[in-house]
Swiss-Prot record:
The keyword GTP-binding does not apply. Residues 58-156 form a propeptide. It is found in: Secreted. GO terms for molecular function: hormone activity; signaling receptor binding. Heterodimer of a B chain and an A chain linked by two disulfide bonds. This is Prorelaxin 1. One of its GO terms (cellular component) is extracellular region. Residues 135-161 are annotated as: Disordered. GO terms for biological process: adenylate cyclase-modulating G protein-coupled receptor signaling pathway; developmental growth; mammary gland morphogenesis; nipple development; prostate gland growth; regulation of apoptotic process; regulation of nitric oxide mediated signal transduction; spermatogenesis. Residues 1-22 form the signal peptide. Belongs to the insulin family. The keyword Oxidoreductase does not apply. PANTHER family: PRORELAXIN H2 (PTHR12004:SF13), RELAXIN (PTHR12004).
Length: 185
């Protein structure tokens, strides 16, 4: 029994001593390649597969990932905000009895007591339309907002064009695997 245990321990130790094939050395990532067509596509898959592409990006851009992780998300609950009384402000024709019932009901709901309100703004349809119009960007060119967003999709277009330039460069001149990983992975 003890010899079998030692044999299993030896096998386990040998497995642990083998280098992990998903990790990539610096020399391999900085290696200069010159490939075209299918070979380029296969190399792209090999570079971006498993953890290879993530390794190339993680070594050069840890601050970018940290900045994305610490992005501030606005909270809807603000303990210093005024009580939630927009119903009473928007409906001036309510009787005093209904206003009293509404204020008592709102006071009994703790989740409504800390909701922020727009105290100085006048809620009107025209103001809402103007705000919506400005936010969608129709004020500049008069075109519908959907068309504007389709026309302003320059980030993905630039990425596609730079990808084509990278494949041509790798075919004619050559490029490093790290530059491919930065562009595609």
């Amino acid at each position: 029994m003890s010899s079998r245990f030692l044999l299993q321990l030896l096998g386990f130790w040998l497995l642990l001593s083998q280098p992990c094939r998903t990790r990539v050395s610096e020399e391999w990532m900085d290696g200069f390649i010159r490939m075209c067509g299918r070979e380029y596509a296969r190399e792209l898959i090999k570079i971006c597969g498993a953890s290879v592409g993530r390794l190339a990006l993680s070594q050069e851009e840890p601050a970018l990932l940290a900045r994305q992780a610490t992005e501030v998300v606005p909270s809807f609950i603000n303990k210093d905000a005024e009580p939630f009384d927009t119903t009473l402000k928007c409906l001036p024709n309510l009787s005093e009895e209904l206003k009293a019932v509404l204020s008592e009901a709102q006071a009994s709901l703790p989740e409504l007591q800390h909701a922020p309100v727009l105290s100085d703004s006048v809620v009107s349809l025209e103001g809402f339309k103007k705000t919506l119009h400005d936010r969608l960007g129709e004020a500049e060119d008069g075109s519908p907002p959907g068309l504007k967003y389709l026309q302003s999709d320059t980030h993905s277009r630039k990425k596609r064009e730079s990808g084509g330039l990278m494949s041509q460069q790798c075919c004619h001149v050559g490029c490093s695997r790290r530059s491919i990983a930065k562009l595609y992975c």
